[in-house]
Amino acid sequence: MSRVRFDLDTLKRLAQFAAQRSSEDRIPQVAGSLTFTTMLSLVPLATVAFALFTAFPIFASFQMSLQIFLADHLMPAQLNSQIFNYLNQFASKAKGLTTIGMIFLFVTAVMTMMTVESAFNVIWRVRKARPIAQRILVYWAIITLGPILIGVSLSISSYLFTQSMTFTAAQRMTPVIEWALAGAALPLTAAAFTILYVYLPNCRVEWRDAVIGGVTAAIAFELAKRGFGYYVRRIPTYTAVYGAFAAVPLFLLWMYLCWFITLAGAMIASALPAIRIGQFHRPTFEGSNLFDSLELLARLSEARDAGKRGYTVPELSRMLRRDMGTTINLLEKLEEIEWIARLQEDGARPHFLLLANPAQITVERLFGLFVIDRAELGYQLELASTRVDGEMLLAALENDKLKVTLAALLTARAAARAAQAAENESGTSSMPHQAA
């Protein structure tokens, strides 16, 4: 019974953790923002991509394969014909633009991808984005080579599928084969989500976490597509109100669902390391960052004294019993003041080392870093609108006891442990005499 209770408590804390992460990452709000951005950049993206197929006639068949695949699998059948007709019309008109106009379209497409990358960096708690030159090169490769490679792959898949259908035309297919053929798009969708989660954030993402997030997002995407298609077909509310214009609001709603599923899958992939090590339910409190930063510095100090090369983020998260997002936030702030440094080796996770002398690391500095920003507080107290005396308040915050160092705290803790061990040992040795 206790095991069941433990599992239920764990599931409850896990649900609270998921709700907290969703609130912190602002998944619904970011999905709405990306929906609006996508509507503005959809024509530029389609124009840049389809212009490549037009410039090289050899790729014309690949373009048809890509359009057919997107029409069948990207959105419900009730919307794809109208939406792709609109896109083709807009893209064909955009081909007559001048060079400046095409540059503007490309910039718009790049800005969309930058928005998506920024959203992923927020979800993975990454503060430092890629250099702008590297980002533009990656985006250009995705925009130009992506449609061609996908078109080639789909053309080959279409050919193989046609050959298999011809081979089995005279035979009666079993329901298992029919189900397998109908779900052939699911692995491609899962692979696309997985690659997106691995390479788009500016951090190292484990493939196993990205695969779980990608498969979850792909399944949710297929279910949403079928459910949304059923809603449009059976409950024609938008058609009755908007008439022929109904495709636009329905497409907006579908784009919002797509982005919500994409971001939710990213949130799952980013939260899996914390869930896997079990550090997702420790409560935070006012001043917990101060305590955790001291504990983190103490661990790095012990590692340096032992001759170790420091610890990685997962190792520190496990020691602090905190999620990786909180640990990364602490490390970044301590790295900014040059108390710690990261050691990056090829293909490995970075290790963090202690640079500062523990005898010079004071609680007062950490108090100002994680609890009260005294510089900002002093500025606010100088404003004419304040009703409290700034000098008295700042003087009250001046406490010599906050000048205690990390070395003193470590020494005091070691002495307390030694005294406790000696007391336990003396108590154990006196037990036989008392029994006698």
UniProtKB/Swiss-Prot annotation:
InterPro entries: UPF0761_bac, Virul_fac_BrkB. Pfam families: Virul_fac_BrkB. Its main location: membrane. It is found in: Cell inner membrane. The chain crosses the membrane at residues 42-62, 96-116, 136-156, 180-200, 210-230, 241-261. Belongs to the UPF0761 family. This is UPF0761 membrane protein Bxeno_A3061.
